[in-house]
């Protein structure tokens, strides 16, 4: 069964829309195989987003991701990765289709409510960053 990682970012957690976002996943055929609410440390955020370390937005991204708690989930199902990408919508909420998570809950390209794995290879790495195999059911 295909798996992908979702992070509900601090802006969406602060707005109290975690339940609505998790419901979107389940309503669209994705099983929540593991989930936890946590506060990322600076080291966690820097390690998780290390692929972006040379990009000009890296510092702001890390600061944002440690600004409040996040909800990290493993989503499972047929076509889980692309299904989650479609549910999230475009990275920039102004470009996201109506009815997507980002169109409905995100403020801007920085505070854009959710993160989702962009490939199956990255999904495996990202899932292992947050969860051991025994924590996923």
Swiss-Prot record:
Protein localization: Cytoplasm
GO CC terms of this entry: cytoplasm
Requisite cofactors: Mg(2+)
A Pfam family per the record: NDK
Active site: 115 (pros-phosphohistidine intermediate)
Gene3D superfamilies linked: Nucleoside diphosphate kinase-like domain
Catalytic activity field: a 2'-deoxyribonucleoside 5'-diphosphate + ATP = a 2'-deoxyribonucleoside 5'-triphosphate + ADP; a ribonucleoside 5'-diphosphate + ATP = a ribonucleoside 5'-triphosphate + ADP
Keywords: ATP-binding, Cytoplasm, Kinase, Magnesium, Metal-binding, Nucleotide metabolism, Nucleotide-binding, Phosphoprotein, Transferase
GO MF term list: ATP binding; metal ion binding; nucleoside diphosphate kinase activity
EC number: 2.7.4.6
Assembly mode: Homotetramer.
Function, in words: Major role in the synthesis of nucleoside triphosphates other than ATP. The ATP gamma phosphate is transferred to the NDP beta phosphate via a ping-pong mechanism, using a phosphorylated active-site intermediate.
Family according to the record: Belongs to the NDK family.
Protein name (database record): Nucleoside diphosphate kinase
Gene: ndk
């Amino acid at each position: 069964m295909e798996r992908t990682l979702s992070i509900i970012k601090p802006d969406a957690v602060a707005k109290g829309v975690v339940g609505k976002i998790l419901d979107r996943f389940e309503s669209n055929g994705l099983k929540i195989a593991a989930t936890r609410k946590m506060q990322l440390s600076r080291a966690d955020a820097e390690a998780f987003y290390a692929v972006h370390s040379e990009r000009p937005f890296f510092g702001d991204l890390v600061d944002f991701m440690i600004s409040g708690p996040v909800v990290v989930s493993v989503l499972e199902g047929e076509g889980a990765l692309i299904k989650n990408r479609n549910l999230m919508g475009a990275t920039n909420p102004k470009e996201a289709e109506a009815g997507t998570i980002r169109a409905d809950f995100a403020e801007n390209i920085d505070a854009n409510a959710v993160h989702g794995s962009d490939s199956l290879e990255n999904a495996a790495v990202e899932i292992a960053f947050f969860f051991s195999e025994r924590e996923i059911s």
